[in-house]
Regions:
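N-terminal segments that mediate ammonia production and transfer
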Residues: 1-175
Length: 175
């Protein structure tokens, strides 16, 4: 049953695909070309959203926000090379963002669970990358529960027949 407040189906719009989202914006190149300009426009869009979801009692304790980009292969190669890590060719690795607890024991356990899952699904764990963050402007409420933000790098098993099979493995790892 479709709520009455939604418009009727027309053209590419179909109300069947509606779901609640607060403060969502999209910036993309129609042909899918990646560029720094698209990222800059996305950051501008994000900065101009007055309300991106939940807002806490502290003016600087919101819900957090970010942007989703295409795989930044050149950037990842550069920053991981600084740590002595060489990536496989583009399309033969995946990157996931993981929020980890600050408690040392829970932190180690969570990393082990992720690494074990990767191995169980026949893929190869390459490395963890700690994502630089700047929390100076966060309120004390948020700082108290702020997680570590890491990226996990996964190498595609060469026996997988194609990129779609790898994407399916990454999907299961993510869950």
């Amino acid at each position: 049953m479709q709520p009455e407040y939604l418009p009727k189906r027309e053209g590419l719009y179909d109300p069947e695909f509606e779901h609640d989202a607060c403060g969502v914006g999209f910036v993309a190149h129609l042909k899918g070309n990646a560029s720094h300009d698209i990222v800059q426009k996305g950051l501008t869009l994000l900065a101009n959203l007055e309300h991106r979801g939940a807002v806490g009692a502290e003016k600087n304790s919101g819900d957090g926000a970010g942007i989703l980009t295409q795989m930044p292969d050149k950037f990842l190669r550069r920053v991981l090379k600084e740590d002595g890590i060489d990536l496989p060719e583009f399309g033969h690795y995946g990157v996931g963002v993981v929020f980890l607890p600050k408690d040392p024991q829970a932190y180690a356990e969570c990393k082990t669970i992720v690494e074990d899952c990767i191995e169980e699904l026949g893929q190869e764990f390459i490395a963890w990358r700690k994502v630089p963050t700047a929390n100076e402007s966060l309120g004390e409420t948020v700082k108290a529960i702020e997680p570590y933000v890491h990226q996990v790098i996964v190498k595609r098993n060469p026996e997988l027949e194609d990129a779609e099979a790898f994407e399916r493995k990454l999907f299961v790892i993510r869950k």
